[in-house]
Amino acid sequence: MQYYRWAVSTFSFLFIFSITALSNANAATLTGKVAFQGTAPPAQIIKADADPRCKLMHPNGIAADEVIVNPNGTLKNVFVYVKEGLAGKTFEAPKATVVFDQKGCQYSPKVFGIQVNQPLEIVNSDDTLHNVHALPANSQPFNLGMPIKGMKIKRTFTKPEVMVKIKCEVHPWMRAYAGVLDHPFFAVTGGDGTFEIKDIPPGQYVLEAWHEKYGTTTQAVTVTADNQEIQFQFKA
């Protein structure tokens, strides 16, 4: 699958989602997509020559991943979540572990969501030194050197924050972002630009879409048992 990257400040994309009621306790599922409008420029290539093992895996360089436009005209790596409307509600941290890997001299996933106090397992799948330097403002920062292939370390974030930047000083092209929330209502757009957020109770909410390059956009929405479609549009 071929991706395109955007490297300038002008942009245009369309954020669309619909609300479909579930029969289970009146909860709803949010589905939608983030679409890019305009002509995508050629990809930028980053040389990996400084690390021989990275160069071996990427002899022609690594494609920059700050902005990825999918073949169907949608945007990848947009974090979508409920920003307002859950006051007074509490949600237990999941026991399921979120895995954050260093593979092919890149972070995977690039953008992810995790709940407060949910286990985060950090893995090095490469036979080279990486470090994971997380820079939260609300939780304790950490900087982990991981020189051994197969090495695993667990950490947690203790306070909500959108977004937490993660970087590797050894390989400066490696950047990732974690959306840390005290609820489970979030998703990240993938290779088709779509997202799905399940089991949202009826009510009035503010949803936010975050992108590494383009920042944030929000819109108020009323979740009911009726199907709905809402659009966010950005133009250069």
Each predicted region: which residue ranges?
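Short, intrinsically disordered, low-complexity terminal segments
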Residues: 4, 18, 22-25
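N-terminal secretory signal peptides that target proteins for export/translocation
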Residues: 1-8
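Extracytoplasmic copper-binding redox domains, predominantly the cupredoxin/blue-copper superfamily
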Residues: 22-236
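Bacterial N-terminal signal peptides
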Residues: 9-21
